[in-house]
Amino acid sequence: MNALLSNPFKRGLLRGETQIGLWLSSTSSYMAEIAATSGYDWLLIDGEHAPNTIQDLYHQLQAIAPYASQPVIRPVEGNRSLIKQVLDIGARTLLVPMVDTAEQAREVVSATRYPPIGSRGVGAGVARAARWGRVENYMAEANDELCLLIQVESRTALENLDAILEVDGIDGVFIGPADLSASLGYPDDAGHPDVQRVIEQSIRRIRAAGKAAGFLAVDPAMAEKCLAWGANFVAVGVDTMLYTQALDRRLAMFKSDSAQPQEKTSY
């Protein structure tokens, strides 16, 4: 195994280890490197809701590379061409949002693997991931080391969860709390008891199927719940939210008329 392609995050999931992560939404390679020095097991670079370009994602991968924290990229959608670009710039772990059916899951699996087992386009000679053609046996090893996580975040996805979990090539399933709570009729209220019950049941179903289960919890108490339910890759904060909260707390120390800092419990 070429060390450049080795995926410690995937290895940790296979061993059943609990890995704690942080969401990166600032689009800044400088902020990404600061986060990488903190010691989180994984760092999610958000290309869905944060205004990241492919170049932005590329620069953040470069910034994180010297450190132990493992990057995970979330593309804006499970588009085949977009997935190809993200993998070519060096992503080894993807979190693909809005997967509602087993058929969608199979399409994403295919897009992330080279032929004959998938349909990923071949361009290793111009790809950072293959060090511009210098990594021997790149295509076979890239298939083996790719870690694919998908997001289940709608009522439809929950109805299809068992079928999704049977799809080969998926390493983990991530429960998207914000979109899921909205889909269930509780927008911006992932803490509602009905939503909490569904989250717990889903995490337990995912783990029972032999897959890793993931979650984003900006509320530490919710993170602890998810870990207790069996989630084993959990993001415990969002960089932009932590930054705004710290700014508000500091200002409130010196200006009595400033707005009191609010601790959000949802993303």
Swiss-Prot record:
Gene3D superfamilies: Phosphoenolpyruvate-binding domains (3.20.20.60). It comes from the Bacteria. Homohexamer. Pfam families: HpcH_HpaI (PF03328). It comes from Klebsiella pneumoniae subsp. pneumoniae (strain ATCC 700721 / MGH 78578). This is 2-keto-3-deoxy-L-rhamnonate aldolase. It catalyses: 2-dehydro-3-deoxy-L-rhamnonate = (S)-lactaldehyde + pyruvate. The gene is rhmA. Substrate binds at Q151, A178, D179. Disulfide bonds: none annotated. The keyword Magnesium applies. Catalyzes the reversible retro-aldol cleavage of 2-keto-3-deoxy-L-rhamnonate (KDR) to pyruvate and lactaldehyde. It is an enzyme of class 4 (lyase). GO terms for molecular function: 2-keto-3-deoxy-L-rhamnonate aldolase activity; magnesium ion binding. Mg(2+) binds at E153, D179. The active site is at H49 (proton acceptor). Keywords: Lyase, Magnesium, Metal-binding.
